[in-house]
């Protein structure tokens, strides 16, 4: 039986969530309907589930969600990961910090040349800094929990997050493109 570890992006990233419907909560209902008919197991770490519940009001369907999706954390204290992963992470983080500083310096020079601080200059700094620092990098405990749980369960990680997919790939975790989840569920259900 296939196992899938879900990230919030399945339900919150507009490009992924639309596969289950236009309305976010109806989309979760559609996912649950498909999950019940699919010969697979679905998991979500507690930290990711808590984050998801802060993003979406699941009050009326929380019990249904927890019926179809196992909510559990990885066994962090008994798992090991290769030291090379940590070395690569530190190397990448150092490079990103340097890029972020260069962007901040560039915008500071532009601001110094301006007679007043334009709001679009601040917005540009914020966007470029975020891109340099976060895009393609695991940047939260929730992200790490999902990757570790997929590794522990030998499950497929379902996420649109580039950083999670990149780390999962480095660690040998099976990956499923989040945009394809509904079709994969339907394919599995049709064969059952």
Swiss-Prot record:
> Which catalytic reaction applies to this protein?
Endonucleolytic cleavage of RNA, removing 5'-extranucleotides from tRNA precursor
GO terms in the biological process aspect are: tRNA 5'-leader removal
Pfam families with a match to the protein in the record: PIN_5
Superkingdom, taxonomy of origin: Bacteria
* TM helices/strands, residue ranges: none
| Top-level EC class as recorded in UniProt | hydrolase
EC number per UniProt:
3.1.26.5
- Keyword tags: Endonuclease, Hydrolase, Nuclease, tRNA processing
Q: Which cysteines are joined by disulfide bonds?
A: none
The protein's GO terms of the molecular function aspect are: ribonuclease P activity
Q: What does this protein do?
A: RNA-free RNase P that catalyzes the removal of the 5'-leader sequence from pre-tRNA to produce the mature 5'-terminus.
Would you identify the family this protein belongs to, as annotated? Belongs to the HARP family.
Q: What is this protein called?
A: RNA-free ribonuclease P
The beginning of the lineage is: Bacteria, Pseudomonadati, Pseudomonadota, Gammaproteobacteria, Chromatiales
